[in-house]
Amino acid sequence: RECCDLSMVQAATLSARQVLGSAPTYPSEIGQDKWVLIKMFPAVDDGFFLDVGSGHGTIGSNTKALEERGWSGICVDPFPTYMDGRTCQVFKEVVSSAAGQVVKFHTHAGLGGIADSLGKWKEEAQKSPAVELTTTTLGDVLARANAPTFIHFLSLDIEGAELDALKGMDLNKYRFGAMAIEHNEEEPKRTDIINYLRQHGYERVHTYRQDDFFAPIAR
């Protein structure tokens, strides 16, 4: 089961394409990529994404399927792996609410993150080596990447530092069509993210397992 159920017509069409061998693959863990491409932007073949905590370039990737559709974007991760064949601009950096902060970062594959922000998987992550890194902000990354001010999809999965990352960019300047943000059922972080995004014009439209899904509030 995945995050977002398809309509009967969509499901039947997808099944037929799978039989014929022409169906796209969706490598994301819980269907974030399928939600974007089928539910949110089914007619968009040239969208733009921001993948923060991109990790493995293929396995579990929330944005590889988007690139295969023709999208472009930015991948941010201090230790990206298996990015051969990916087309996103890769920034090997750690992001927070402010630039220039020296932080301790645990390098655990898939669960690594800033030591002071780690939540649900903290004990597991702390078993991995730690290095010192200097933070940047998403605002700085977007500026250096010459990103468009409208970004179709934000994927944010950085093990407890999601709210700090959001605060590191101007959400009045950069607008998003859809967001999938990991919360890992951590409070008050989860509620703080929901409230912060609502203040900037977004509402939660779906939730599944460790992610909340957001879209602009309908006017």
PLM regions: where:
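Phosphate/nucleotide-binding beta-alpha loop and adjacent structural elements of enzyme active sites
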Residues: 1-219
